[in-house]
Regions:
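Conserved acetyl-CoA-binding loop-helix of GNAT-fold acetyltransferases
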Residues: 37, 43-56
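Conserved short alpha-helix immediately C-terminal to the canonical SAM/SAH-binding motif I
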Residues: 50, 74-77
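Conserved GNAT acetyl-CoA-binding A-motif
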Residues: 51, 57-71
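Conserved beta-strand in the GNAT
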Residues: 8, 15-23, 31-36
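Conserved catalytic-core motifs of GNAT/GCN5-like acyltransferases
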Residues: 67-69, 79, 84-101
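A conserved beta-turn-beta hairpin within the catalytic core of GNAT-like acetyltransferases
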Residues: 24-33, 42-43, 92-96
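Short loop/turn motifs at secondary-structure junctions and domain boundaries
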Residues: 1-2
Length: 104
């Protein structure tokens, strides 16, 4: 996608270990998605680094808010980063999801 911002973090061997994407959702509003961290490296700060880089990119282009859709199991991670739930949970592919957002 030509308008997407992709962040990929690599370990010291050059292997990708964490990733995320930022899209323009509406004027002044970004949408973060495709956040993933290698399972064995979770809780090591990789996800927070990806999220911070995506938020910085959103700010740099003038976004005032970012939205995301997360699996319910990741809720606490995003809440620690300042996100709050927006709306009711839903099921997708048998996994409960929630919409979250954060002002920048």
């Amino acid at each position: 996608d030509a308008t997407a911002v992709h962040v990929v973090l690599r370990n010291r061997l050059g292997m990708p270990v964490a990733t995320g994407r930022l899209l323009q959702h509406a004027p002044g509003e970004g949408r973060i998605g495709r956040m993933a961290v290698e399972r064995a490296l979770r809780s090591g700060g990789w996800g927070r680094q990806v999220l911070r880089a995506l938020e910085d990119a959103a700010r740099a282009r003038g976004d005032q808010r970012v939205l995301l859709q997360a699996q319910v199991q990741a809720r606490a991670f995003y809440e620690r980063a300042g996100y709050h739930v927006h709306g009711e949970p839903w099921m997708e592919a048998g996994i409960p999801h929630i919409a979250m957002q954060r002002a920048l």
